[in-house]
Each structure stands twice: as structure tokens, then as C-alpha cells.
A protein has these predicted regions:
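A structural signal for short, well-ordered beta-strand segments
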Residues: 38, 66-67, 98, 120-122
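Acidic, metal-coordinating catalytic segment for phosphate/diphosphate chemistry
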Residues: 2-37, 41-43
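A glycine-rich, hydrophobic loop/mini-helix early in the fold
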Residues: 35-67
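A residue-level structural signature of the nucleotidyltransferase/glycosyltransferase Rossmann-like core
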Residues: 7, 46-47, 140-141
Length: 181
């Protein structure tokens, strides 16, 4: 079994308690597990937004942050973030920084699948061109951070539930990364 096929289970305090196979974890009664969200910026200060592939099990076709994922058992979070950036976007990244260390959410998608995650949020810089994996990303766009904030403020239901919650909490960080202070 590959590292990326496992999800780390955690208790209410965020302590690792074990792992489960990723293919069995997301259901109507998803246990609390560890994940991450990352907002990727280019050299012009734009943030990458992606539309999830239509074949994704959860929230297919929904616009969201740059990428998300789960660390494997024993895998450092920054290694998991770098691994997912390469897998989903075909890009190397740098300057990874945690901006919302205690973010947690629960959400249910249209099919009844529940996300139940302790999901620290990171920002990073792209170190190359995006070559999106079509099994992960249907579309993508580099946009100004101010446009992302305005879109989420105006119509939060049109983005993933985690992005709708994260963007208002990290407004200052998004603007700073985008060169707007």
C-alpha cells in the first residue's frame, strides 16, 4: 500500500491515533482525520484557484483553493504538501508557510459524503509552470487575491466549503502574499 493511500486519524486534540485506507475513510460517518489546504502564489502575486475534476469522489467540479490533501502516516506535513503539488499540479513549490494551524471543519457534499478534518492551511510559492493532472483538476486560473476574497465574500456557496471558511480567516495573509498590504 502506498503512503498516499492512507489517511491519518486524529482525536479531538489533533493527536494522531492511527490510520485508515483512504478509499474507505470518506462516508456519511467520516472519522476525524488530518488533512491540509494550500494556497499557491506565482511570482506576480496571483493566487491559483482550481476546479476539482468531475471524477473526484467529493465535491466534483467545485472551485476551490490551489490544492488539498492528506499526509501519510509518519509523513511530515511539508513533504505531503510538496508531494500533492507535484501530483495534482505538476509543479515544484517553495516558501511553504502555515497560516491557519488550527483550522477544522465538517461539511457534507451533495452525495452525503462528510468531510471531517483538522486541516491546517498553508501558503506557498510556485516554482514552475502548472501542468494539472486531469484526474485531480478540471480547470485552473491565476487570479488576484482581491478577486478571490471578493468572490468568496459575494458567493461563498460557489466554492468548496473549506475555502468559503478559510478565505475570510486568512484575508490579511492573502493580500500580503498578493502584494497588497
Amino acid at each position: 500500500m502506498l503512503l498516499e493511500d492512507r489517511v491519518v486519524l486524529v482525536d479531538e486534540g489533533g493527536e494522531r491515533t492511527g490510520w485508515a485506507e483512504k478509499s474507505t475513510i470518506h462516508s456519511a460517518s467520516t472519522p476525524l482525520h488530518l488533512a491540509f489546504s494550500c494556497y499557491l502564489f506565482d511570482e506576480a502575486g496571483r493566487v491559483l484557484v482550481t476546479r476539482r475534476a468531475l471524477t473526484k469522489r467529493t465535491w466534483p467540479g467545485v472551485w476551490t483553493n490551489s490544492f488539498c490533501g492528506h499526509p501519510g502516516p509518519g509523513e511530515p506535513m511539508t513533504s505531503a504538501i510538496e508531494r500533492h503539488a507535484r501530483h495534482e499540479l505538476g509543479v515544484d513549490i517553495g516558501d511553504i508557510r502555515e497560516v491557519l494551524p488550527d483550522f477544522r471543519y465538517t461539511a457534507t457534499d451533495a452525495s452525503g459524503i462528510v468531510e471531517n478534518e483538522i486541516c491546517p492551511v498553508y501558503v506557498a510559492r510556485s516554482r514552475g509552470l502548472i501542468v494539472a493532472n486531469p484526474n485531480e483538476v478540471a480547470e485552473w486560473a491565476w487570479i488576484d487575491a482581491t478577486d478571490l476574497i471578493a468572490a468568496v465574500d459575494a458567493t461563498p456557496r460557489l466554492v468548496s466549503p473549506w475555502s468559503a471558511l478559510q478565505v475570510p480567516l486568512m484575508r490579511a495573509e492573502l493580500l500580503a502574499m498578493g502584494g497588497v498590504a
